[in-house]
Amino acid sequence: MFDFGFSELIVIAVVTLIVVGPERLPKVARTAGHLLGRLQRYVSDVKSDIKREMQLEELKALQQQVEQQARELESSMRGEAAKIEADVNKTVAEVKSGVTVDAAPVPLTHAVEAPAAPAPMSLAPHGDAASAGREPAAVPGSGPEKA
């Protein structure tokens, strides 16, 4: 801060001793120390205030940048939503134009019959009396074939 050498400090101490006197010198030195301490605290407070203001300015710039990006994102999202809405409206209009409200329902030209019930199946084993009167089914390739 100050560029005083040792010899310059000795000269200042001797002049102060002569001017103030040996009786009041300790009290003056204590007061000077308190004043110097206050000065150092004041300087450090000013430095911290300046640093805080600089950080505040940086934060404001960052906030503005984030807000700008948010506005850009919002506008692009609104544009995309408008495109999608237009596509949906176009599709709805196409569907509405293809379907007419006045169209009568088309009557059925033939009746659908219910399928016939399946024939009951025998649960009896192969070798019992229920199947004794029937012939076994022909296995392809095992007997004479008619051409």
UniProtKB/Swiss-Prot annotation:
Keywords: Cell inner membrane, Cell membrane, Membrane, Protein transport, Translocation, Transmembrane, Transmembrane helix, Transport. The chain crosses the membrane at residues 1-21. It is found in: Cell inner membrane. Signal peptide: none annotated. One of its GO terms (cellular component) is TAT protein transport complex. Gene3D superfamilies: 1.20.5.3310. It holds the Pfam family TatA_B_E. GO terms for molecular function: protein transmembrane transporter activity. Its main location: membrane. InterPro entries: TatA/B/E (IPR003369), TatB (IPR018448). It is a single-pass membrane protein. GO terms for biological process: protein transport by the Tat complex. Residues 117-147 are annotated as: Disordered. NCBIfam families: tatB. Belongs to the TatB family. Part of the twin-arginine translocation (Tat) system that transports large folded proteins containing a characteristic twin-arginine motif in their signal peptide across membranes. Together with TatC, TatB is part of a receptor directly interacting with Tat signal peptides. TatB may form an oligomeric binding site that transiently accommodates folded Tat precursor proteins before their translocation. The Tat system comprises two distinct complexes: a TatABC complex, containing multiple copies of TatA, TatB and TatC subunits, and a separate TatA complex, containing only TatA subunits. Substrates initially bind to the TatABC complex, which probably triggers association of the separate TatA complex to form the active translocon. This is Sec-independent protein translocase protein TatB.
